[in-house]
Amino acid sequence: MVLHPLFAYPTVLLALGVFALYIVSLLKLRGMMKYALYLNVVLIVFALLSVVFGFGISNVPLVQSKVPFIWEFPHKWNGVFLFVLSVLTFVVFWFKGETAGKKLALLPVLGLLLTFFQFFTGWMLRLVFFS
């Protein structure tokens, strides 16, 4: 059963929301931090499931024969890195909390950039696979 798309799309949307909430909470509204932390827990679960099912689908022979390496390799390992970054972001902001400085806004900005790159490579894989 192919469950990667079921978890991948919510993961991208959650990542955009969580990292945007972290940026907003660091720059303007400090009260948004708790919502970002709660959603980050959900993001970690969805990202883990996306990575696990993504590795599962990459072992299917049809996928291996149709998907070019130039899109599969960065998509696969960027997904793992996005999962690790979401865990790292949660740990950092869980311990720092309200005392986090504005310099830590670089961590969610990096998360947003990785999320956009993950969405782009996934979309290109989809276009290549279904063409």
How should these model regions be labeled?
Residues 1-131:
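Polytopic transmembrane helical bundles with strong interfacial aromatic enrichment
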